[in-house]
Regions:
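Hydrophobic transmembrane alpha-helices and their immediate loop junctions
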Residues: 2-201
Length: 201
């Protein structure tokens, strides 16, 4: 098997996606940590503002990466078939809702939010909240968690009530843009509340 054929296979595609996502994760974390350290060292307004903005963005990007890989591992641990995309992408794999069992789809669904929770726990463990930037980082992560919970949990409830996975997906996400706007507002509200609470504590 040639190197080109190996790279084009499922394992090669997964390796490529993992490296790209890891690079994006480390870049987001690195930019934030640099700006946060600058803000902590100077206490000046501009570095602090930049650290807050970087924290919010990094919280979102890092949460998204953990969320998608949580979905992936949930599906794979349940024995579901997944198709890895050839080109690097934020949503890096496809899941066959029509051909998967309810148990497999529920495992997929549970894995995503668990990934969000995991990155929050790891961040709390490794970065004490001693700056507005770090408060913003956690706020971005909490906001992302609330967004995905309101966006995805209704599908889980429909499947648990006996609806076929593909019907549950189509029925819920068929609401279109109003659904995403509503979940975005809830996520932003949760993130803002988290940020203000951490600043006061």
């Amino acid at each position: 098997v040639s190197n080109e054929d190996s790279a084009a296979g499922p394992t090669g595609k997964l390796r490529t996606q993992a490296l790209v996502h890891l690079s994006a994760f480390l870049a987001s974390a690195g930019v934030f940590i640099s700006l946060d350290n600058w803000a902590l060292a100077t206490g000046a307004g501009v570095p602090t503002l930049l650290a807050i903005l970087a924290g919010l963005l990094a919280g979102f990007f890092m949460s998204h990466i953990f969320h998608e890989w949580g979905h992936f591992f949930g599906a794979r641990l349940a024995g579901a078939a997944t198709t890895i995309k050839a080109q690097p992408a934020p949503l890096f794999f496809d899941f066959d809702y029509a051909g998967s069992t309810a148990r497999q789809t529920l495992a997929l669904s549970a894995g995503g939010p668990l990934g969000n929770v995991l990155v929050i726990v790891l961040t709390l463990y490794s970065l004490p909240v001693v700056s507005p930037g770090r408060a913003a980082l956690l706020a971005g992560m909490v906001g992302s968690l609330v967004f995905v919970l309101f966006l995805e949990l209704p599908v889980t409830r429909r499947i648990r009530s006996g609806e076929a996975p593909i019907d549950a997906m189509m029925g819920h996400f068929g609401q279109g843009k109003p659904l995403f706007r509503r979940c975005t507002r809830l996520g932003v509200a949760a993130g803002a509340a988290t940020f203000l609470t951490l600043l006061v504590l």
